[in-house]
Curated annotation (Swiss-Prot):
SUPFAM superfamilies in UniProt: Immunoglobulin
Keyword DNA-binding: no
Motif (Cell attachment site): 127-129
Top-rank taxon: Eukaryota
Family: Belongs to the immunoglobulin superfamily. CEA family.
Protein's name according to its UniProt entry: Pregnancy-specific beta-1-glycoprotein 3
Ig-like C2-type domain residues: 147-234, 240-327, 335-410
Gene name of the encoded protein: PSG3
Length: 428
């Protein structure tokens, strides 16, 4: 700190004596052009330390001065005042017992606390030459000593070149900056090493032996700096991405035997099979050799298309294959004919459609009384007559499965004398 004038031999008066002093100071409260400046020593203030608010450019013929906490010049914010005549010091409501005022108007605050940070106002008055009081303001920020940081990791045991890891510097500290070190060197930013916006979190993408550490983080503010203990990631051996081979991706429902094989083969891995994201349950229908690398399904249904995955595991964890989905061939099922009306009147339009569940989609054809009419799912005959009565059949065929099926219905057409078809319906 700079040189100080020794504190005067003073009379110490409580804030209640302020009223008399205020009357004295206000007597000389006239305009002035003098410029008072205030600076802090040290310039960066930390908790528990001392700070001196050092005043420069004091006017001549000083009558006295008043210090306030904040920028409001009122009794509530009044810390202390000094009257040159009589070297009188008066303490106000904002005085904490840690402030020392000097004859050069400087204010020493000892053992600074959080509550001390902020703005201070100095009001100075002159006497006798027609000048008036002058006000100076100063604000300081309190910095805490940085704590010793520690590094937390999303995963201390990542798979080599496979898994991402985030390292976070704890604790989160206000008014502080974060620095990272790897192998004792300032951290280089690459595509595999990225920092969060506030630099508190470090992201590592695809950790290798060259980026496993050790890592250190540092918390720094204007008054202190602290560095963490080193943290090194423990790389686990890289697992190969498994894949599935299969003897038939287009099996026929309830006919073809399927064999799934999980590659690559290794005695060091355990194999697990998954169906629709669930571990494949033990079932009489599912056969697995002892090593479990091969999965055999004696038959498959349309509800077992998958996806299928296999997983290889070592003692540290596992990795799954890409999913494989089967194209199960089935059908055609027994077709259905819509609508199911069987009675019509002459002059009405006949419109029938046929549907059968099938993969791939079935081929459709229509016959009337055993005589081929047309191919397709829909049959339309405008203004039917009694001659259109007979047995209507829809035949379906799946060329992939080699299966066929058919459905028939009897249609009766009444003579023109009636109106509207009968209400009775014959469900198929």
């Amino acid at each position: 700190m700079g040189p100080l004038s020794a504190p005067p031999c003073t009379q110490r008066i409580t804030w209640k004596g302020l009223l008399l002093t205020a009357l004295l100071l206000n007597f000389w409260n006239l305009p002035t052009t003098a410029q008072v400046t205030i600076e802090a020593e040290p310039t960066k203030v930390s908790k528990g330390k001392d700070v001196l608010l050092l005043v420069h450019n004091l006017p001549q013929n000083l009558a006295g001065y008043i210090w306030y906490k904040g920028q409001m010049k009122d009794l509530y914010h009044y810390i202390t005042s000094y009257v040159v005549d009589g070297q009188i010091i008066i303490y106000g409501p904002a005085y904490s017992g840690r402030e020392t005022v000097y004859s050069n108007a400087s204010l020493l605050i000892q053992n600074v606390t959080r509550e001390d940070a902020g703005s201070y106002t100095l009001h100075i008055v002159k006497r006798g030459d027609g000048t008036r009081g002058e006000t100076g303001h100063f604000t300081f920020t309190l910095y805490l000593e940085t704590p010793k940081p520690s590094i937390s990791s999303s995963n201390l045991y990542p798979r080599e070149d496979m898994e991402a890891v985030s390292l976070t510097c704890d604790p989160e500290t206000p008014d502080a900056s974060y620095l990272w070190w790897m192998n004792g060197q300032s951290l280089p930013m690459t595509h595999s090493l990225q920092l969060s916006k506030n630099k508190r979190t470090l992201f590592l993408f695809g950790v290798t032996k060259y980026t496993a550490g050790p890592y250190e983080c540092e918390i720094r503010n204007p008054v202190s700096a602290s560095r963490s203990d080193p943290v090194t990631l423990n790389l686990l051996p890289k697992l190969p991405k498994p894949y599935i081979t299969i003897n038939n991706l287009n099996p026929r429902e309830n006919k073809d035997v399927l064999a799934f094989t999980c590659e690559p083969k290794s005695e060091n891995y355990t194999y697990i099979w998954w169906l629709n994201g669930q571990s494949l349950p033990v079932s009489p229908r599912v056969k697995r050799p002892i090593e479990n690398r091969i999965l055999i399904l004696p038959s498959v249904t349309r509800n077992e298309t998958g996806p299928y995955q296999c997983e290889i595991q070592d003692r540290y964890g596992g990795i799954r294959s890409y999913p494989v989905t089967l194209n199960v061939l089935y059908g055609p099922d027994l077709p259905r004919i819509y609508p199911s009306f069987t009675y019509y009147h002459s002059g009405e339009n006949l419109y029938l459609s046929c549907f059968a569940d099938s993969n791939p989609p079935a081929e459709y054809s229509w016959t009337i009384n055993g005589k081929f009419q047309l191919s397709g799912q829909k049959l339309f005959i405008p203004q039917i007559t009694t001659k259109h009565s007979g047995l209507y059949a829809c035949s379906v065929r799946n060329s992939a499965t080699g299966m066929e099926s058919s459905k028939s219905m009897t249609v009766k057409v009444s003579a023109p004398s009636g109106t509207g078809h009968l209400p009775g319906l014959n469900p198929l």
